[in-house]
A protein has these predicted regions:
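Nucleotide-activated sugar donor-binding and catalytic core shared by glycosyltransferases
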Residues: 1-409
Length: 409
């Protein structure tokens, strides 16, 4: 692969590379999971509208590939979570990161854009920044929740941090880090008022039947820890509500296989559940209540205006380390509760995440229209807060950075 045209003064981290003609823009992007793949695809499309001849290389998933990414590796190679879980794959991840660094140095792109995956991307960004490559980190780590010291580390790694949530730039300002709120692209993917009937028709669901969506995670480890309990919860809810239907979107083929195996073992009535290939968006719009693993799915359910119950269970040793090291800065885990600043949706974490507790929370929401209404009304307010331009705003901030010789703060 030939080097990207242009030369740079590599004598210091602040050295600005030569800015080539727009037609020859080159961007390297690295995303490590399904949510990053979604953000990366939107960003590629927005950047291409500015630079029609641009080239995009790096690590991404199916959405980024469809948007035009030349993939060096699939995003799943980076998808690992937890302090303990990463250890068996550490050598592989370090080797992969070294290869991405070498490729990026050879190409010398207009910008390297790390999308989330901070434990993989920040060290990589720091080395590329030192080589005179402009670096952008898209999606702030959850510094408002744990390991706030990462905010200072980002300033050493990234020339620019693109924040999805409005409370984040103020944290970075305390560390002198350039950070911009660009809004969350998912806020533009859902209307403020959503309709249920078209989604149900698309999935072949009865218009008047109660529907529960199950989203146990987009990682195999999450499905292993939560999938069986989610299905057991669904079985108990179905016993209480004989007309209850289930929709279960699988993030990818591996997740589908894992979920299918759990469904086979659970022996739920086949006529009452649907396992979907992706299509979480439609599943959320079709349902009445969502039971999901904490993460981006909670934000998507919030934006779909669907009442939800959040659950999560990490590996026991990771949980003990987090508690022992006092890494957590918040007693709220899900984005709806963090954004609302209160316990808006039920959260059942670690020891509290049991089948009886999950079942009670799900049935309480399914059976209480006023409780659902309280969540939905607040979801509408929070949706408005997250509008900021999304992918277009992110592309504009990147364009401003690469087109300025010094790079604006």
């Amino acid at each position: 692969m030939s080097a990207h045209p242009g030369s740079a003064d590599h004598s210091s981290p602040s050295a600005a590379p030569h800015v080539p003609a727009r037609a020859s823009r080159l961007f390297v992007l690295v995303a490590g999971e399904a949510s990053g793949d979604l953000l990366g695809a939107g960003l590629i499309e927005a950047l291409r509208r500015r630079y029609p001849q641009a080239r995009f290389c790096g690590v991404g998933g199916p959405r980024m590939l469809a948007a035009g990414l030349e993939a060096w590796y699939p995003a799943e190679r980076l998808s690992v979570m937890g302090l303990v879980e990463v250890l068996p794959r550490l050598v592989e991840l370090l080797r992969l990161r070294g290869d991405v660094r070498r490729r990026s140095l050879a190409l010398h792109p207009d910008a390297f854009i790390g999308i989330d995956a901070p434990d993989f991307n920040l060290g990589l960004e720091r080395k590329l920044k030192a080589a005179g490559i402009r670096t952008v980190h898209y999606v702030s780590p959850s510094v408002w929740a744990w390991r706030e010291g990462r905010a200072a580390r980002l300033g050493r790694s990234a020339d620019l941090v693109l924040c999805l949530f409005p409370m984040e730039p103020a944290i970075y300002a305390r560390y002198g880090v350039a950070a911009h709120f660009v809004g969350h692209p998912l806020a533009d993917a859902f209307p403020l008022v959503t309709e249920r009937a078209p989604a149900r028709a698309a999935l072949g669901l009865a218009a008047d039947a109660p529907v529960l969506a199950l989203l146990p995670g987009s990682r195999l480890g999450e499905i292993a820890r939560l999938g069986s309990d989610f299905l057991a919860t669904a079985a108990q809810a179905m016993a209480s509500m004989p007309n209850l239907q289930l929709v279960i979107p699988a993030a990818n083929a591996e997740c589908r296989s894992a979920l299918q195996a759990l469904l086979d073992a659970a022996a739920l009535p086949a006529a009452r559940w649907r396992l979907l290939d992706g299509d979480a968006h439609t599943a959320l719009l079709a349902c009445d209540v969502v039971l999901l693993a904490s993460g981006t799915a909670a934000l998507e359910a919030m934006l779909a205006k669907r009442p939800l119950v959040v659950a999560y269970r990490i590996a026991p040793w990771t949980y003990r380390l987090v508690r022992w090291l006092r890494l957590m800065r918040t007693d709220r885990y899900s984005l709806p509760n963090i954004l609302a600043g209160r316990a808006l949706v039920p959260e059942l974490m670690q020891e509290a995440c049991t089948v009886p507790a999950l079942t009670r929370a799900v049935l309480d929401l399914l059976g209480d229209a006023s409780a659902r209404s309280v969540q939905v009304q607040e979801f509408e307010r929070l949706h408005r807060l997250l509008h900021g331009g999304g992918s277009e705003a992110a592309a504009a901030a990147i364009a401003e950075r690469i087109e300025s010789p010094a790079g604006p703060a």
